[in-house]
Amino acid sequence: MTPKVMIILGSGSDIAIAEKSMKILEKLEIPYSLKIASAHRTPDLVRELVVQGTNAGIKVFIGIAGLAAHLPGAIAAYTHKPVIGVPVDVKVSGLDALYSSVQMPYPSPVATVGIDRGDNGAILAARILGLYDEEIRKKVLESKEGYRQKVIKNNEEIVQKIDNPHITNDFLRIKNLELNETTEEFNGSYINKNAEVVIIVGRHTDLITGKKVSVTLDRLKIPHDMQVICPIRSGKKFRAYVNTMKNAKIFIGINSNSSQVSGGLVGLTEKPVIGVPCENELGNNYLLSTVNMPPGVPVATVGVNNGRNAAVLSGEILSINNPVLLELLEKLKNKKINI
């Protein structure tokens, strides 16, 4: 049986992070393969694993590496399948590995998750696979609910046990609150409800990056919709739009400021969420607040301002079961299409 996911470690010392990934994949009952191959010390082995794995039917690759973590990028060089990068903290708090993984050139994206977040790498892989496998999607939803319940239970297990003189534990007790999902519909002037990809731009100054996503999706003939909605200024509108577009397969958040777009999206859907961190007018970028998400809510982060790679990553995900799109994607990645 061909596994659905291949995990490649850059070194045996990365096994602790891989164990986080394997624990999730075992829980979700997703077949996987684990290999150790270095982008620098065994480049031919990396190539053979990726090429033969792709030809055999691997759907998603996960590259786990620290230091100058070029492994995920090396994997992306030899496959049209989605590649997830998990940077490992070895030195300088893992920032060297993070930048090596996320700042990939067009058209070779790596869907990077937070430093040491092997668990989120596996959850992201499951979200991708859940687009094509209803049983996996159901398990992703169950896992998502488990993370939600853990937060709710912490109120009883931690907060309710605090016995300070002036704390009012029974005020708005969490277990008694009724938490309902949004059912409101978005009332925009025009939306494409048949969109496979939804792009949400957090503010108008980030539209230049959003347009890069849109142009590349057009070249790949992927139907999409794009709106400018700030989840901080327009929270109700944001939730209504996500609810209205719930049948889309991929959500892309264009982030600046505190990167609330992609973070807000990933909590509202079980679909893959791609984050594009942007620079603001002061030259600050919001990479860290996009990528370093807590357990259970991965954001597939691409490089700063790299909207085109977000679109290519969408194409890689959607082409898993779409040979027509795969042909377009391969032409683009082989630079036969002039973007």
From Swiss-Prot:
Matching NCBIfam families: purE
Pathway connected to this protein: Purine metabolism; IMP biosynthesis via de novo pathway; 5-amino-1-(5-phospho-D-ribosyl)imidazole-4-carboxylate from 5-amino-1-(5-phospho-D-ribosyl)imidazole (N5-CAIR route): step 2/2
Entries under SMART domains matching the protein: AIRC (SM01001)
Catalyzed reactions per annotation: 5-carboxyamino-1-(5-phospho-D-ribosyl)imidazole + H(+) = 5-amino-1-(5-phospho-D-ribosyl)imidazole-4-carboxylate
Organism for this UniProt entry: Methanobrevibacter smithii
Isomerase in keyword set: yes
SUPFAM superfamilies: N5-CAIR mutase (phosphoribosylaminoimidazole carboxylase, PurE) (SSF52255)
Pfam families found in the cross-reference section: AIRC
Molecular function terms, GO-annotated: 5-(carboxyamino)imidazole ribonucleotide mutase activity
HAMAP family (alphabetical): PurE_classI
GO aspect biological process, one term: 'de novo' IMP biosynthetic process
The protein's Enzyme Commission number: 5.4.99.18
Name of this chain's protein: Probable N5-carboxyaminoimidazole ribonucleotide mutase
Family: Belongs to the AIR carboxylase family. Class I subfamily.
UniProt function note: Catalyzes the conversion of N5-carboxyaminoimidazole ribonucleotide (N5-CAIR) to 4-carboxy-5-aminoimidazole ribonucleotide (CAIR).
UniProt keyword annotations, A-Z: Isomerase, Purine biosynthesis
Positions that bind substrate: 11, 14, 41
Keyword Repeat: no
